[in-house]
Amino acid sequence: MGMFVNPDNSAFQVALNSEIYVDKSGLIKYTNKVLNTLQGYICNSRPRRFGKSVTANMLTAYYSRGCNSEAMFADLEISKSTDFKKHLNQYDVIHLDIQWCMEPAGGSEQVVPYISERTIAELKEYYPDALPVETKSLPEALSQINALTGKKFIIIIDEWDVLIRDEASNAKAQEDYINFLRGMFKGTEPTKYIQLAYLTGILPIKKEKTQSALNNFDEFTMLSPSRLAPYIGFTEEEVKSLAEEYDQDFEEVKRWYDGYLLRDHQVYNPRAVVSVMLRGEYKSYWSETASYDTVVPLINMNYDGLKTAIIEMLSGSEVKVNTATFKNDTINIKSKDDVLTYMIHLGYLGYNQKLKTAFVPNEEIRQELTTAVESKPWNELLKFQQDSENLLDSTLDMDGVAVAVQIEKIHNEYASSIQYNNENSLSSVLTIAYLSVMQYYFKPIRELPTGRGFADFVFIPKPEYKSDYPALIVELKWNQNVRTAVQQIKDKKYPSSILSYSGDILLVGINYDKSTKEHQCLIERYEKD
């Protein structure tokens, strides 16, 4: 049992000792399945606070022959698997935490020599006859051990990408590290000594000339999680169970911390869910572990369409994003799409794999992103926020004429790239125009199911503002009549679907006349029976 070679299971025991532990050992069924196969090279990337280290520690505790973990896993899902004991504590495991290695190594350029020297020294304790004194290369050492003994290794690397993210300008450190990884995992020789390779970090593997530097790895990311989706964050069913156990309002938890759409799973941020269960406070827990130092420079980059995209997403809209151009490093960001893709990997944005769109996933992230934007505000954002505030005030004053004028102004000045063609384009402008309501209202619900039809937008006030702000039901029309829009709300019995959310309700009808290129607006207060 060593620091890097065949560690014990104490790190995973800490997770099990915690008041809340959500069983993710089902992941081991997959890793057992791909042991000693070409699919046994896994890079599982996800944002901070999504349980990367807990997962790495779990795999180490299960596979390492430096400990006995049968009792530890006895009540977990993996214990029901037929091959549970077959692989339990049966392998030589090398577990590296690159973030931790930075300090004892004495700097980024010394990380590779430090890891190699320390790991080889520990390997010599297990295989003293297999390693010549002159062996300095870790890949060579593993190859020599395999040639003499036939032994294969499980390699687990936590925070694999820290040198890619944090040392972006240090070309030597990055080159040495990428070459180290190539030596460890790429080519025919590593297949002889690798039983399983599991890398976890925030970024997928760095691309070079559009190809992965380690293209033999299967990548599971926030863009394409594949079959590992249930093991990235907490699933909806897991959160429902916790909410019931801790007597928390599941719908409130969902508004605050849901929104990461991974394959067919709604995934929640684990750290935030655990915090709200233990503390009972609905707030942002993001800034306790994530720094603005990364995202503020990103959103202030001067790429065409970036700031408009940020405003649109803060307003509740989704924006198209081409994720293919991002090279999975921070030095080669060249466009709006690269920025948005990086923000998806960081967890500041969600991603719809089917629609290829990015969006702000939940209330927690909306608050954090708004704070990040306001920490170094753009002049155009400050002016836009004021215009949006004026629009909200006019809406609450039921001044339809002023609302129409302000929506037209916002379209012309901030969203002119959105060409009016139909009701969908009008709705895109509307979400941008009402950005200011995000302080007082939840993310607007698009096409809320109602009594006899659908409302285009429903703005529901947050509980703390319910007595001061009415719910807003907005019906959009194209080349029709605002009175028709308001009457349609009444005819379809829209308000019945939200009476439980709010006391007062305003009905807002908005029409755009293509021939006159003018907006019209009519606002009425809903009179309850």
Regions found by a protein language model. Give the residues of each.
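Active-site metal-binding core of divalent-cation-utilizing nuclease and nuclease-like domains
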Residues: Q144-T149, M438-D468
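Metal-dependent nuclease catalytic cores in nucleic-acid-processing enzymes
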Residues: G183-T191, T341-L349, T431-S436, Q488-V508
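Mg2+/Mn2+-dependent nuclease catalytic core
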Residues: Q174-F180, W478-P495
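Conserved catalytic cores of phosphodiester-cleaving nucleases, focusing on short active-site segments
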Residues: L430, A455-P461, Y469-Q480, K492
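Catalytic cores of nuclease domains that cleave nucleic-acid phosphodiester backbones
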Residues: A415-G451, A455
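Structural motif
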Residues: I154, P470-V474, L506
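Domain-level recognition of nuclease-like catalytic cores that cleave nucleotide substrates
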Residues: S497, G503-D529
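Phosphate-binding site recognition
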Residues: M1-N422, Y441, I445
